[in-house]
């Protein structure tokens, strides 16, 4: 299936009026990753899944090459627990990590986006059983979810299931009849978040995974110090070095290694492949 994400008009930050791209066109923007719910419904995907006895949908929404599509551990936990929603988390590195916070509110699993989490709350710490000081809100959402199809079908019938969140953005628009490109945020965009379904779920499972194994996002420009193409490649290279070393292959520290997912999804599959005894140069493994 291929289907389009929905859109919402952008409004002026000062007076709430809808911004215009031209005299006959509204300034429209994507309605957030939560727009997936209405898109799945409107495209007929959910009904098709029910008719073909597809009970579970896997969902990953960010540029993360280490996200394993249909992760067997996540799917297994989800099915064995008969969950409506299951999700992966990693431990936060810093209080101000730009990732969502998975929390319990009145014993209900919920998500608070980093932009909506007060700094003093994010910085709170606690002491674990080993006497180590840890962040109180440590569970970082990495946007890997598994949903029950029946749950999504139920939620798709509830027009109020996903509220809209305001996002201050810079939007090119008409001003006094001229098209202008502001240098500071001038508009509000309306976005829905898929994790706002969590409070509606009867059973939610949260699975912690290792950052070095499951999370190498590409979100920032090259000049940034984290979540760039360069840092993503470095994380992948370190992981593949470990895989190869643990299978008995000697790998030169300076060699850049990449393993195509069709060649091996994990170390267990890699062990079944014919591998060189030593790698000294940059190497790409593929079928």
Residue ranges and their predicted role:
Residues 1-54, 242-287:
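Conserved N-terminal catalytic core of the sugar/cofactor nucleotidyltransferase
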Residues 49-58, 66-250:
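Catalytic core of tubulin tyrosine ligase-like
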